[in-house]
Swiss-Prot record:
Localization per record: Cytoplasm
Molecular function (Gene Ontology), one example: ribosome binding
Protein name (record): Ribosome maturation factor RimM
InterPro entries attached to this UniProt entry: PRC_barrel-like_sf, PRC_RimM, RimM, RimM_N, RimM_N_sf, Transl_B-barrel_sf
Higher taxonomy: Bacteria, Pseudomonadati, Chlorobiota, Chlorobiia, Chlorobiales
Assembly with partners or alone: Binds ribosomal protein uS19.
Key word rRNA processing present: yes
Protein encoded by which gene: rimM
Primary location group: cytoplasm
Originating species: Prosthecochloris aestuarii (strain DSM 271 / SK 413)
PRC barrel domain residues: 95-168
Length: 169
């Protein structure tokens, strides 16, 4: 598989006896699973193979997914722990002033005086809001992804400007 893949979910466990799977969606749009006909499934991006979707439903924040060819609990157990990927073509267009996590990871982080202070390593999803994990020298700093601290995000320049960064050190 040569296309760039994006993590959409993780297979947690079988559900029932007929091959249904409980999936933790790794997306803000779990309902997108309901329209998908094909998904890529594998332990890694490199090992991912296409699987045809036989059905999907949402239940309590999880996706219940069925694939053609996965017809028993034993079949389902054989892919527990694997990841579900989609291609860039399958990404849902975002509203203005929003970005995918993969677009934010790697952005240079600047303070309001345009001094570089680090690089975004990850975006953590916490109950109250997302948090940027920033590698700042030899430290990892967590900054809430809220307007109070984030001045501007410029994906074209590959930069994010943060105010009051010294409060997080």
């Amino acid at each position: 598989m040569n296309k760039l893949l994006y993590l959409a979910g993780r297979i947690l466990k079988p559900k029932g006896l007929k091959g249904e799977l409980k999936v933790l969606p790794e997306t803000d749009f779990p309902e997108s699973f309901l329209q998908r006909k094909l998904l890529l499934v594998g332990a890694t991006e490199q090992s991912a193979v296409e699987r045809r979707v036989a059905g999907a439903t949402l239940q309590n924040g999880f996706v219940l997914l069925r694939f053609y060819g996965i017809d028993s609990r034993e079949d389902a157990e054989s892919i527990v722990g694997e990841r579900i990927y989609i291609t860039e073509d399958d990404l849902i267009p975002l509203p203005p002033d929003t970005a995918y996590i993969h677009d934010l990871v790697g952005l240079r982080v600047l303070d309001e005086d345009c001094r570089e202070i680090g690089v975004i390593r990850d975006v953590l999803k916490l109950p109250a809001h997302e948090v940027y994990e920033i590698a700042a020298g030899d430290k990892i700093v967590l900054v809430p992804a809220i307007e109070e601290f984030v001045v501007e995000t410029d994906l074209e320049k590959g930069e994010m400007t943060i105010r009051r960064f010294d409060e997080f050190l």
